[in-house]
Each structure stands twice: as structure tokens, then as C-alpha cells.
Amino acid sequence: MRKTRLWGLLWMLFVSELRAATKLTEEKYELKEGQTLDVKCDYTLEKFASSQKAWQIIRDGEMPKTLACTERPSKNSHPVQVGRIILEDYHDHGLLRVRMVNLQVEDSGLYQCVIYQPPKEPHMLFDRIRLVVTKGFSGTPGSNENSTQNVYKIPPTTTKALCPLYTSPRTVTQAPPKSTADVSTPDSEINLTNVTDIIRVPVFNIVILLAGGFLSKSLVFSVLFAVTLRSFVP
């Protein structure tokens, strides 16, 4: 029983280290209302130059939602505008530029640049973007100093989403309890109620442990027997 608990503890530590190593990194942007988010996502030029790229938002307990995507095949430096989102794909530099103009508080959230390749899973580019938009100060001379609400005027080349709705073929299970609801917080709890059913210790290891214990007990018994025997010898 004690060995099972020890193996369970070691397994828990291993899983925790594995989760920490594979945790997706995030880059945080803190902006005010009316400002512009400007993100540049690098990609492998030889592999993804003409691939369709997309800008997605990730909400807790839901699959990523595509907000805008480039044409297919993606055209070099051709701006695509969907609402307040502008995408520009620079093939020469292997760079996707994403701008969200006239930011609002409700735009706060977690975003990502991806290679959009249905029915395959999207391939994520760059780090995920944690956007935090706060209220600006109105009525002051510098309130609109950094605002780019009316700066980017793109010709009406593309004003609708070009990517069809795509649902991942994976089965989406119900969102886990609150401890795993926040995307930015890694899981720290592991259910080990059925550890005995999950962890199977190799038989060879058990034999080695039992043999070692048996030999240790035999050695102690032999020493005690020798000491006792000498005490009775005149």
C-alpha cells in the first residue's frame, strides 16, 4: 500500500512537471479604449507562404473562434478587413500582421494567430495574445493621443469573413470544474482516487523490492543469532 502511494506521488510530480513544460506562453498587451492592437506573427516562409491565416479568440471552455482570415491562397500584402480587424500577409518576410482598431473593453480576451487548414487542426503561430483593454480618460487634451480609430482606412477590398465556419472533429466534452475554467491558470489538481487502477508497477520491480527486503531481514536474523549464540558459549 505504501509503495502504491509512493508511486502515485511520483506520478503526480511527473505530470505536474510535464504540464509546466508544455504550458503555452502568453504575451500580454494592456491598451486603452480607442487604441490599436498591432501584432506581428512570424511563420515558416517555405512552408506556409500561401497558406490561409486566421485570427482567433479563445473563450473559457469553448473551441477557438475564427474572427477573420486571409484569402486562399493568401495574397502578398493584400489587406483583409473584417469589422475592426485588419490582416496583412507579407510573404517576403514570413509575417502576418494583425491589427484591431478602435479597441473596446469587451475586446479583452485571449487571442492567437494560426495557419487555417481545415479539416486539419489550426497550426498556432507566435505566442498567444492576452489583451486587456481599459477605459480611457475622456475630456483631456491627450485622451486621443494614441488613438488610431480613424487612422486605418482600408479600401473595401474585403469586408466579410472569407473562411467558412469549421468545427473541430474532436468530441467537445463539457467544461471541467472551476479549477480548470481559466485558460491562463494551469491545472494544479490531479484526481488520484483510483491510482491503484491507473498505475501498474512492473512485476520485476516488485520482485526486486521483495528480494531486497527478504535478504535484509535474513541478514539481521543471522547477526542476532550469532550474537545470541556467543553469549551462551563459555
UniProtKB/Swiss-Prot annotation:
SUPFAM superfamilies: Immunoglobulin (SSF48726). Keywords: Adaptive immunity, Cell membrane, Disulfide bond, Glycoprotein, Immunity, Immunoglobulin domain, Innate immunity, Membrane, Receptor, Secreted, Signal, Transmembrane, Transmembrane helix. GO terms for biological process: adaptive immune response; humoral immune response; immune response; innate immune response; intracellular signal transduction; neutrophil chemotaxis; neutrophil-mediated killing of gram-negative bacterium. The keyword Iron does not apply. Disulfide bonds join C41-C113. Residues 21-205 are extracellular. Residues 1-20 form the signal peptide. Mostly expressed by immune cells of the myeloid lineage, such as monocytes, macrophages, neutrophils and dendritic cells. Expression is associated with a mature stage of myeloid development. Highly expressed in adult liver, lung and spleen than in corresponding fetal tissue. Also expressed in the lymph node, placenta, spinal cord and heart tissues. Isoform 2 was detected in the lung, liver and mature monocytes. InterPro entries: Ig-like_dom_sf (IPR036179), Ig-like_fold (IPR013783), Ig_sub (IPR003599), Ig_V-set (IPR013106). Glycosylated. Residues 26-134 form the Ig-like V-type domain. It holds the Pfam family V-set. One of its GO terms (cellular component) is extracellular region. Glycans are attached at N146, N191, N194. GO terms for molecular function: receptor decoy activity; scaffold protein binding; signaling receptor activity; transmembrane signaling receptor activity. The keyword Signal applies. Residues 227-234 are cytoplasmic. This is Triggering receptor expressed on myeloid cells 1. It comes from Homo sapiens (Human). The gene is TREM1.
